[in-house]
Structures are given as structure tokens and as C-alpha cells.
Swiss-Prot record:
Source organism: Rhizobium leguminosarum bv. trifolii (strain WSM2304)
MF (Gene Ontology): 3'-5'-RNA exonuclease activity; magnesium ion binding; polyribonucleotide nucleotidyltransferase activity; RNA binding
This protein's name: Polyribonucleotide nucleotidyltransferase
CDD domains hit by this protein: KH-I_PNPase (cd02393), RNase_PH_PNPase_1 (cd11363), RNase_PH_PNPase_2 (cd11364), S1_PNPase (cd04472)
Keywords associated with the record: Cytoplasm, Magnesium, Metal-binding, Nucleotidyltransferase, RNA-binding, Transferase
């Protein structure tokens, strides 16, 4: 019934198995991939023909984690998986980025790649395996795909590169880098690092590229026995149309791209585009080409002209040379009632970034396949349509916004203080108010400024820069701080963030083969210079974290209590802790290890809560005098609440120095009294005395003390 084919290899000390022919046989391509004991199913379906009028390649990648893969049941009322998590969105992008450039230009058939995690061994992260499985499924599908693509994770532990480290090894690693590519080219890099230099980062990229070569061999081996017949796809040849367009409009287009101001340049290019349409769509004549074809070729021509100009003149669209960064203005304290704020403007790219400090209650609970964990640093990136002068949808963040936010998050996180050093939850929101390239790197810079303005003790300021690279034959140009117009015409786009001493995040997207290690080294060196320049400009606003928190930020005091006292502080059904919160106004968070965080914008509220908790967990000392409240009277004495929630008995003989006939003759419920702790009886009950204490002053009465000692 099944025509199953399997290839197995040993990869980084663990077995990798690729299997096809048994599951999801109606898909164009399907591969069940196993690494260690983590299993993913990747499927590919591509429409047989493009939709009429389709003018782009509609590729969709969906990565999904099923909770059953880790032996769990989803939370929530419906008990089933809901909308994609942040990780699912990020891994979908991770798979998409290296495979998209390998589809031939002109292929516009609706294509969907679905990767499902069906088993997780809690040792091997499914993201790299998913990339491999998707590549294998595409290679088998018969869809025009110039792969295969391989992928690998690289760690850096004790000065050594590690291929595909286990999840628990990543805690020791100063690098988390994922690299993908073909036999002869690196196509994608995504990373987070702890201030590593350019040489180490580039070495990791090349180490990973070498490390996934056996995976490419395995995919080819599987394709030799299981691949479907390649679909017949011949891209249209529009070289004749391009030549005619060049002949008539090259000069005008070149003039348009000499205009350095974005809006004026767009207007000039649109005017040329209108002339192109008039030329190729004369009235009363049947057009030779469709509007979609004319638009696509014109766009291609725009890219060519800009690339030629840059390579020939070493001058950019906006008049800059290759390495100059646009003018930068950094401001902090823009919104004084927020906890920390910054406005970062670089050319026509601008971000308002606001930092908010919260308590442990504000931490984000993340339910992943590897278990529930809490995240104390949140960074949210928003890209409203007005930032590029357009109208558009407003609502929940899209994949791009989530991806850009995570890139900035990775860049900043290595410089954050530990929870012990700074027990706050941090949320940063970046509102992109203008965009003309590199808004994610503006977010990095603005986040660094806003956190320092908020008084967060960042180890060092962090800056980011977006770079481009153009390669034609043996000529190449590296562009620093690229514009939006330059973003798509380059052969390599990469973003580097870090401090003055090293890289904290590197993201690369390489679209062609031929970009050598030496070229990447030159590009990273130029990026280092740009990053240093931006850090210098940021320093004009603020150089280090403020010595104190903002006026409106909460204060947090940390204290530790014995674990066996946690129940007493919380109380039955949370009664005690609720009372402390209500009476003092402070927020209280208690960890399982006995760490107590007390938060409030008022120092008095924090101190009141601290004293209350201390009175609950501390043990009263024999011989000490305490203030208390009579909570109950009886024939044999009075019960007094003292030392927090603790009660003790003042026997009728200890109420006063003279003989007392009735307890109520001396005290009533609600009376404030001074008591001395005499000790504990054989059952552990507290024995108190009032008669040895002056009820007016709270001081011990010397004569009564002597009598007491004589009696003992």
C-alpha cells in the first residue's frame, strides 16, 4: 500500500531520518523528519496554475507546534490549539526566508508549506529540523525549486563552536545562531550573541554552512529515488521589452534617481512610470503586454539603474557615499510621566520608544512545548501605515512586526541586568512614526535610550545598523544604513546590532551565490564602523543609565522568607496577603523559593508591607516587649494579638500587679496594650504578661521584674 523511501545519516552525534511515501500522500511533497526523537511533518502543495492577474509569488509557510507532541493538553476553555504563538510565527519566517529566493522569477502559483511538530524529545529544537524537512518536501514535490536548502544551529561554548547543541546546552552558550543555505551559498542567518566580535560571528556562519552539507547530501539521495517529475515551467523572456524600455526611458529614470528627497523622487519616478504606460498602451491599439508585465519589468529596470549608479559612481539614491550614515537625532525624556522614553530619528526613519517597569505580576507566562516559563523582558514593535504615508489595516501585529520586534529583543537582551540585580519586569514599545529603511534597527537604538532613561542598569548602550551589498561580477559595493528603496535591490541585506565591544544580534538574508567569506568580512567590518558612529550620536543624548528610577516608576524591595513560612504569609485562600495588599497599597509577589518582591511608588507603603510580612515570619523573642491588641477576653485572662498575626494569653494573674477579680475590669476587646513575652508552655502556647510593663510608656517596671525573677 505504501511506497516508502527513507534516508538516515548521523548528524552532530544524533540520527537524522528523512522518510516519504507513507504520510500525506496527496500533497505534492511530504517528508517525515526525525532528529533524535523530535519528529516533524513537512508538506508542500502548489497550485497547478497562477491566479489570473497575479503579480507576485504567493508563498505561505505555516509552522505549527501540537501540544500532544510533548504529551500535554492545551490550556484554555476549548482545550485546543489557537492562533499561532510567537515562536510559531518566528519559525515560519525562519523557514520562509531561505526558501523564497530559490523559486524562479516569474513563478506565481499559490504555494503553501506546512510544517507540524508531532513529537518533541525536549532535547532537540524542532526549528532547524523543520527547515530541513520543508526543504526536502520542496525538493521532492516537482515544484520549480532551486534547492535543496540545509540548516544548522551553532553554539559557542568555552571558545569552541558546537553544531546543533542540545536545548540544555544553550544556557552555557554565548551564541545562538541559525544558518541556512545551499551547497555553495549561505542564504540566511539569525542570531543572538553575548558581545562576540565579527571574526567569531563570521566563523560561526561558515562552521554552520559546513556542518549542514551532509544534510544536503541526504536530501539529494532521497530525491534520487522519490522525487516527482519536475513541473514544466519556463519563465517568460521579457528581455526585448526591457531593452525597449531602457532605450526610451533610461535617461529620465536616471535623472529621477538623482533626486535625494524621498517624496520628490517618488513623484519623478511615478511620472516616468506614467509615460511608460502611455508608451506601451497607446489608445486604440491592442497592447502587446499586460499591465502586470509592464509593471514588473519597470520595477526590475528601476533596480538595475540604481545598482548601476551605485557601482559606477559610488553614490547612493540620497546622495550619500557608501559608508555614510544618515543624520541622527537622539532625545530622551520625551514623555516625562512615562517611566522612560526616547525619540530616535535617523534620516526619514523615526521611532518613539517607551519603557515601562512592572512587577513580577506583569511577567508574561509562556506555555511552550518544553514547559511553562516566565518572560520578564517584552519588546513590542508597531508599524502603523502612516509611517510610510499610506492608509492601511490597523489591528493585531503581523508576522513582520513580530519578527522585527524579536530581532530588537535579541539585540538588547544580552545587556540587561539579571532579575537579582534589577527585579523588575520590563516592557518596551516601539512606535515607528516614520520609515524609510531600517526601522528595526531604529527600534534597537531607541530601546537602548529609553531603558537608560528609565534607570534600567544596561551593561552598555546598544546600537543597530542595516546594511546592503550589491555584487556584479567581481565588483561589489557595501551600503551602510540602507534606505527603503535600497532594501530590495541588493544581493545581501543584513542587520547588525551590538555594543562598542561586540555583536549582540546578526541577521542576514543573502539572495545569490558568489558572496564569499571575504566579501562578508568586508561588509561586517564596514558595519562595525557604522555601529560605532551611531553609538557616538546616541551618547549625545545619554551615555549610561540614570542613577535612579523615574518619578512615576514603581519601587521594588526584595526580601527573603523561609519557605515553610510562605503559607503563613499567604494565608488560607490568600486571606492574609490580600489583607496586606489592601491595607498597605503595595503589590506583593512571592516566589516558590521564598523570594518576596514588594512594589509600590510609595516608600511608606513598601515599608509598611515589609514590616507586616516580617512580623509574620519572624519569631518573637522571650523577654521582649511588644504592643498588641486585645482580641478576646475570658474568665482566666485575655488573648492579645501581637507581633503581626500571632496571639498569646495574658493569664488573669498577669493582668495587673494587684489581684484581679474579673478580666473585664482591666481590659476590654480592642484595647491597645503592652505585653512582655514570658515564654511558651509545654504545648507551645504563648505566655504573656501585662503587669511587668508600664502601660503608659511601654517600658518594663523594675520592681515587677525583680518579683517575676524571684518567682521563677
Amino acid at each position: 500500500m505504501f511506497d516508502t523511501h527513507t534516508v538516515e545519516i548521523e548528524w552532530a552525534g544524533r540520527p537524522l531520518k528523512l522518510e516519504t511515501g507513507k504520510i500525506a500522500r496527496q500533497a505534492d511533497g511530504a517528508v517525515l523528519a526525525t532528529y533524535g526523537e523530535t519528529v516533524v511533518l513537512a508538506t508542500v502543495v502548489s497550485a497547478k496554475a497562477p491566479k489570473p492577474g497575479q503579480d507576485f509569488f504567493p508563498l505561505t509557510v505555516n509552522y505549527q507546534e501540537k501540544t500532544y507532541a510533548a504529551g500535554k493538553i492545551p490550556g484554555g476553555y476549548f482545550k485546543r490549539e489557537g492562533r499561532p504563538s510567537e515562536k510559531e510565527t518566528l519559525v515560519s519566517r525562519l523557514i520562509d526566508r531561505p526558501i523564497r529566493p530559490l523559486f524562479p522569477e516569474g513563478y506565481k502559483n499559490d504555494t503553501q508549506v506546512v510544517v507540524t511538530v508531532v513529537q518533541h524529545d525536549l532535547e532537540n529544537d524542532p526549528d532547524v529540523l523543520s527547515m530541513v524537512a520543508a526543504s526536502a518536501a520542496l525538493t521532492l514535490s516537482g515544484v520549480p525549486f532551486m534547492g535543496p536548502v540545509g540548516g544548522a544551529r551553532v553554539g559557542y561554548i568555552n571558545g569552541e563552536y558546537v553544531l546543533n547543541p542540545h536545548l540544555d546546552e544553550m544556557d552555557e552558550s554565548s551564541l545562538d545562531l541559525v544558518v541556512a543555505g545551499t551547497y555553495d551559498a549561505v542564504l540566511m542567518v539569525e542570531s543572538e550573541a553575548k558581545e562576540l566580535n565579527e571574526e567569531v560571528m563570521l566563523g560561526a556562519v561558515m562552521f554552520g554552512h559546513k556542518g549542514f552539507q551532509p544534510v544536503l547530501d541526504a536530501i539529494i539521495k532521497l530525491a534520487e529515488v522519490a522525487a516527482k517529475e519536475p513541473r514544466d515551467f519556463q519563465p517568460e523572456d521579457y528581455s526585448e521589452l526591457e531593452a525597449e524600455m531602457l532605450k526610451h526611458f533610461e535617461a529620465e529614470l536616471r535623472e529621477g534617481y538623482k533626486i535625494t528627497q524621498k517624496a520628490d523622487r517618488y513623484a519623478a519616478v511615478d511620472a516616468v512610470k506614467a509615460k511608460v504606460k502611455a508608451h506601451f498602451f497607446p489608445e486604440g491599439v491592442e497592447p502587446k503586454y499586460t499591465a502586470e508585465v509592464i509593471g514588473a519589468v519597470f520595477k526590475h529596470l528601476q533596480a538595475k539603474i540604481v545598482r548601476w549608479n551605485i557601482l559606477d559612481t559610488k553614490s547612493r539614491i540620497d546622495g550619500r557615499d557608501l559608508s555614510t550614515v544618515r543624520p541622527i537625532v537622539s532625545e530622551v525624556g520625551l514623555l516625562p510621566r512615562t517611566h522612560g522614553s526616547a525619540l530616535f530619528t535617523r534620516g526619514e526613519t523615526q521611532a518613539i520608544v517607551v519603557a515601562t517597569l512592572g512587577t513580577g505580576e506583569d511577567e508574561q507566562y509562556v506555555d511552550s512545548l518544553t514547559g511553562m516559563y516566565k518572560e520578564r523582558f517584552l519588546l513590542h514593535y508597531n508599524f502603523p501605515p502612516y509611517s510610510v504615508g499610506e492608509t492601511g489595516r490597523m489591528g493585531s501585529p503581523g508576522r513582520r512586526e513580530i519578527g522585527h520586534g524579536k530581532l530588537a529583543w535579541r539585540a538588547i537582551r544580552p545587556m540587561l541586568p539579571t532579575a537579582e540585580q534589577f527585579p523588575y519586569t520590563l516592557r518596551v514599545v516601539s512606535e515607528i512614526t516614520e520609515s524609510n529603511g531600517s526601522s528595526s534597527m531604529a527600534t534597537v537604538c531607541g530601546t537602548s535610550l529609553a531603558l537608560m532613561d528609565a534607570g534600567v542598569p544596561l551593561a552598555k548602550p546598544v546600537a543597530g545598523i542595516a546594511m546592503g551589498l550589491i555584487l556584479e561580477g567581481d565588483r561589489f559595493a557595501v551600503l551602510s544604513d540602507i534606505l527603503g528603496d535600497e532594501d530590495h535591490l541588493g544581493d545581501m541585506d543584513f542587520k547588525v546590532a551590538g555594543t562598542a565591544d561586540g555583536i549582540t544580534s546578526l541577521q542576514m538574508d543573502i539572495k545569490i551565490a558568489g558572496i564569499t567569506e571575504e566579501i562578508m568580512k568586508v561588509a561586517l567590518g564596514q558595519a562595525q564602523g557604522g555601529r560605532a558612529h551611531i553609538l557616538g550620536e546616541m551618547a549625545k543624548a545619554i551615555t549610561e543609565s540614570r542613577g535612579q528610577l523615574g518619578e512615576f516608576a514603581p519601587r521594588i524591595e526584595v526580601m527573603n522568607i523561609p519557605v515553610d513560612k510562605i503559607r503563613e504569609v499567604i494565608g488560607s485562600g490568600g486571606k492574609v496577603i490580600r489583607e496586606i495588599v489592601e491595607k498597605t497599597g503595595a503589590k506583593i509577589n512571592i516566589e516558590d523559593d521564598g523570594t518576596v518582591k514588594i512594589a509600590s511608588s510609595s516608600g511608606k507603603e513598601i515599608e509598611a508591607a515589609r514590616k507586616w510580612i516580617h512580623s509574620i515570619v519572624a519569631e518573637p523573642e522571650i523577654g521582649q516587649i511588644y504592643e498588641g491588641t486585645v482580641v478576646k477576653t475570658a474568665d482566666f485572662g485575655a488573648f492579645v494579638n501581637f507581633f503581626g498575626a500571632r496571639d498569646g494569653l495574658v493569664h488573669i494573674s498577669q493582668l495587673a500587679s494587684e489581684r484581679v477579680a474579673k478580666t473585664q475590669d482591666v481590659v476590654k476587646e480592642g484595647d491597645k496594650v503592652w505585653v512582655k513575652l514570658l515564654g511558651f508552655d509545654e504545648r507551645g502556647k504563648v505566655r504573656l504578661s501585662m503587669k511587668v510593663v508600664d502601660q503608659a510608656t511601654g517600658q518594663e517596671i523594675p520592681n515587677e521584674k525583680k518579683k517575676e525573677e524571684a518567682a521563677e
